[in-house]
Amino acid sequence: MGRRSTLYNYNGIPVNLREGYASFIEATKQAHPDKSLVMNAVSRYGARQIGETGKVDFFYNEVWADEADFTNLKAILYENGVYGNYQLNTVFAAYMNYNKADNRGEFNTPGILLTDAVMFALGGSHLELGGDHMLCKEYFPNENLTMSEELKTAMVHYYDFLTSYQNLLRDGGTENSVSMNCTNGEMRLNSWPPQQGSVTTYAKQVGGKQVIHLLNFSQANSLSWRDVDGTMPEAALITKAALQMNLSAKVNKLWVASPDAHGGALQELAFTQENGVVSFTLPSLKYWTMIVVE
């Protein structure tokens, strides 16, 4: 339900709804121990109480205008990690092109793909498909916006990618920082958080692999995941960017994969390593490319 004003029980005594979440979940699990449970932390409301029960299967966060920035998504994932003892993944209920959906039209593909790219790269997932259509409002039967054939195809690639590389995307790991630069001027790079006019990197160490996500904000007209009016511009395709990154450990293999290219299939790349600097050429970046160093 999210945040409400002061609430009262039948006898007129104030009730802290959020503090009641835990006992509600505990009682439900006790009554139905064989059932899987999930509870919606609307705008983060009650997320700590929900997660600390240890009785839900994943976090479910319905996010709204008060959490409209891409940085808010990462903050939610961090908090949920703490609340769930780093054992639970997060699903965002996040309605795209919300204002545009007041009238009939078509989803804005660039906005959808950039948001999914960020959510997936950060380790989250996105509840955005309901029945036979994409969700644009909290009233799920709303079908004012339709998906183009391009978007339908892209959704298959993005969810195939999320599934194929789930161990790298959603199976823990330690966030770190990898210094990276482009030596032929094909892209401007910055480390998380995102900047307009730039390609943002987000890095994690996952087991014996160093993972670096490239997220393309080069053409972005805002840093809001919601793309409420459906105006996010299409990202320009970047090809053959000469990249260097500082890695002290010996590199045995370097590969990339993207839901925007080759159906998400990995491509092993040639590279050189000298004095802790790894040099290679990135085949392409549209919205999201994942670099994996072994």
Predicted regions mapped to residue ranges:
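Acidic-and-aromatic substrate-binding clefts and catalytic sites of carbohydrate-active enzymes
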Residues: 42-49, 63-76, 99-109, 136-137, ...
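Aromatic/acidic polysaccharide-binding cleft in carbohydrate-active enzymes
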Residues: 4, 84-177, 206, 218
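C-terminal beta-strand-rich structural cap/linker in extracellular carbohydrate-active enzymes
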Residues: 274-294
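Carbohydrate-binding surface patches
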Residues: 187-249, 289
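Acidic (Asp/Glu)-rich catalytic clusters
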Residues: 50-53, 77-86, 119
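Conserved, mostly hydrophobic/aromatic
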Residues: 57, 119, 212
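Solvent-exposed beta-strand/loop surfaces of large extracellular or lumenal domains
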Residues: 253-278
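Active-site neighborhood of glycoside hydrolase catalytic domains
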Residues: 1-58, 64-75
